[in-house]
Amino acid sequence: MNLNKKIQKNNRNSNIELLRILCIISIILHHSYYHSDFSNVTLENFNYLMLYLIEILGNISNNIFVLITGYYVVNSKVKLRNIIKLVLESIFYSYAIMIIYTIINGKVDANIIINSLTPIMHNSNWFITCYILLYISIPFINILIQNLNKKQYSYMLFIAITIFSILPSLGLLNQYFSRYIWFIIVYLVGAYIKKYDCKELYLKNDLLFVFSSISLAIILIVKKVWNVGLIINIDNNNFIMFILGLSIFVEFINRKIFYNKYINYISSSVLGIYLIHDNFIIRPIIWRKTNLKAYIDKPYFWLYEILIILIILSLIHI
């Protein structure tokens, strides 16, 4: 076996690990916008305009995480210990943060204790809850995939994406949306790309990226400035957001495989970073203390934003 094959077999593809890192950075950026108070700040403020347009990458990144899972797990057996490890990691960070907070705060809060003891059941972090539910379902999803031919698989995806993405993006059938169901659909798309090696998608990827990026930017500005429900749904299942995430994912899997131990080391901490910074106790503390609104009109705003992101990325290594 040559060195390149050994790297592919024994080490994770650093293209995908780099994509994971970029995704968690995008999610932190999204949370900095979503959980901060920007009342009375308008799009005339350039920093705010850029943050408003870029933060949507957080929602897109959630889809990319699931696409990656579908791409790599479709041909694997999900072992019970992997599911248990995922659940225990979620519980560990929840317990640890609760204990530290209670000690520092000097008093016991019953609601915090209850929510911390059962983070998955109380949906303290919707992404982690949905991801764990998806992971539990993967063995059964993979059985379905194995028993479908390409035509059946394609038809199933067409129906699912139409019902749960295209129509809701136009303000139709929103009441039937479920993030868990959407994660299953996105997983199926990632698995489809892996199973059938969609070369035609690779060839059209640049066009998809440009079209979806421009379309999404126009939609966001129109929605904000004129308060028009042109695209009523700006959730993870928004069709244009899904296409943009898909094109980013395809770009990274289409690159030449390489290995970098530093990228892979940082990437291995992504789940922990997500669990810590978006913990229901930590979340309000971070975005209240950083007070981004006070810096939004400063020329060094983005340096401040980058500093916050770097600090959050380093939390797991403290």
Residue ranges and their predicted role:
Residues S32-D37, Y101-V108, T162-Y176, S215-G229, ...:
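C-terminal ends of transmembrane alpha-helices
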Residues I56-N59, F127-Y131, Y176-F183, L188, ...:
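Residue-level hotspots within the lipid-embedded alpha helices of multi-pass solute transporters
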Residues Y153-D197:
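Loop-centered beta-sheet repeat module
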Residues L173, I181-F183, C198-Y274, D278-I308:
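Alpha-helical transmembrane segments and terminal signal-anchor/GPI-anchor hydrophobic tails
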